[in-house]
């Protein structure tokens, strides 16, 4: 009856909360920093200062960074830079975490009530190099499709993107590049942090 359904619903909710708690405990410093930035920005509209205990790799190195946010297994925001725009990876994460949570044009800005349900990943991009169709592999490489000033990027290892043609087609569509236009292809590897 109704009580059983409610009981099942409560169990499912508890299971989800425990799952997210386990993910939070296992977060590496890159992801924890991205989450802390989003929570601070969404709750208080403040941009947090860099914490003193970040790994040296985040403070000394520069790279393009993508911050992806999911809710209930679905993308909720994803913004990034394919080349560094700041002095270090920590600042790059901070800027892109704020943008992913509040400025992704595909989604409304994230609100307080969603914060406990969000799961984050941070991609640190390697060197971007010219590529041929044959060199691409959607499991290993991200792709940038370029036509004059238009440019579309797709990260590697995305659910539902299994072939090079799918990867190129989606990246081209994101950039507003049409099938009959000449394109240049570029590839890059990422280190994905959870």
Specify the residue positions occupied by each region the protein language model found.
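Basic nucleic-acid-binding interfaces
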Residues: 3-194
């Amino acid at each position: 009856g109704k009580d059983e359904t409610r009981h099942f619903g409560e169990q499912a909710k508890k299971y989800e909360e425990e799952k997210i708690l386990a993910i939070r405990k296992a977060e590496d410093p890159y992801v924890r920093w991205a989450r802390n930035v989003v929570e601070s920005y969404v709750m208080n509209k403040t941009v947090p200062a860099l914490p003193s205990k970040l790994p040296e790799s985040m403070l000394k190195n520069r790279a393009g960074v993508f911050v992806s946010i999911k809710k209930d297994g679905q993308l909720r925001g994803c913004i990034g830079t394919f080349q560094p725009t700041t002095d270090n990876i920590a600042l790059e994460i901070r800027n892109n975490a704020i943008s992913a949570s509040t400025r992704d044009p595909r989604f409304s800005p994230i609100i307080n009530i969603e914060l406990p349900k969000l799961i984050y990943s941070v991609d640190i991009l390697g060197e971007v190099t010219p590529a041929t169709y044959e060199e691409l592999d959607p499991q290993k490489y991200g792709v940038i499709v370029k036509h004059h000033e238009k440019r579309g990027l797709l990260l590697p290892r995305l659910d539902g993107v299994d072939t090079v043609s799918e990867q190129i087609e989606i990246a081209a569509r994101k950039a507003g590049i049409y099938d009959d236009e000449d394109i240049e292809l570029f590839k890059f590897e990422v280190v994905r942090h959870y």
